[in-house]
Curated annotation (Swiss-Prot):
Residues with O-(pantetheine 4'-phosphoryl)serine modification: 87
Record-linked InterPro entries: ACP, ACP-like_sf, ACP_chloroplastic, PKS_PP-bd, PP-bd_ACP, Ppantetheine_attach_site
Role: Carrier of the growing fatty acid chain in fatty acid biosynthesis.
Protein keywords: Chloroplast, Fatty acid biosynthesis, Fatty acid metabolism, Lipid biosynthesis, Lipid metabolism, Phosphopantetheine, Phosphoprotein, Plastid, Transit peptide
Transit peptide location: 1-49
GO MF annotation, one: acyl carrier activity
Any one GO cellular component localisation term in the record: chloroplast
Domain named Carrier: residues: 52-127
PTM comment: 4'-phosphopantetheine is transferred from CoA to a specific serine of apo-ACP by acpS. This modification is essential for activity because fatty acids are bound in thioester linkage to the sulfhydryl of the prosthetic group.
Originating species: Hordeum vulgare
Associated pathway: Lipid metabolism; fatty acid biosynthesis
Domain of life: Eukaryota
The name this protein goes by in its record: Acyl carrier protein 2, chloroplastic
Pfam families assigned: PP-binding
Upper lineage: Eukaryota, Viridiplantae, Streptophyta, Embryophyta, Tracheophyta
Length: 129
């Protein structure tokens, strides 16, 4: 026999979610599975923290650095690895971003960049300083 319980976590922005308060399983009877679902108010939304303009500019720079065709879709959630970038390409992307935005990215920060959104968020935080 197994059982589980969960509770909801609230955030400031809207989203539709279902909270599972109780789940139970019985080894004796397969039809003894119960769920009690409750709607949760809309409070959570996943969104890129960076400005839209920053994300778009980073997308353009990534496309240019990786010599991607114009029809290749690059968005905030695009990972450099999925776009075909290796570690050297990633270093070149960071250098291109530093030049384009007039910033300096520390090596420790550069190593945390895996997606366009990561880069845009870091850039906005550095430009704001």
């Amino acid at each position: 026999m197994a059982s589980a319980a969960a509770s909801a976590v609230s955030f400031a922005r809207p989203v539709k979610a279902i909270c599972v308060n109780s789940v139970s399983f019985s080894a004796l009877r397969k039809d003894n599975v119960s769920f009690r679902l409750q709607p949760v108010p809309q409070r959570f939304s996943v969104c890129c923290a960076a400005k839209k303009e920053t994300v778009e500019k980073v997308c353009d720079i990534v496309k240019s650095q990786l010599a991607l065709s114009d029809d290749t879709e690059v968005s905030g959630s695009s990972t450099f690895a999925d776009l075909g970038a290796d570690s050297l390409d990633t270093v070149e992307i960071v250098m291109g971003l530093e030049e384009a935005f007039g910033i300096s990215v520390e090596e420790s920060s550069a190593q945390t960049i895996a997606t366009v959104e990561d880069a845009a968020n870091l850039i906005d935080s550095l430009v704001g300083k």
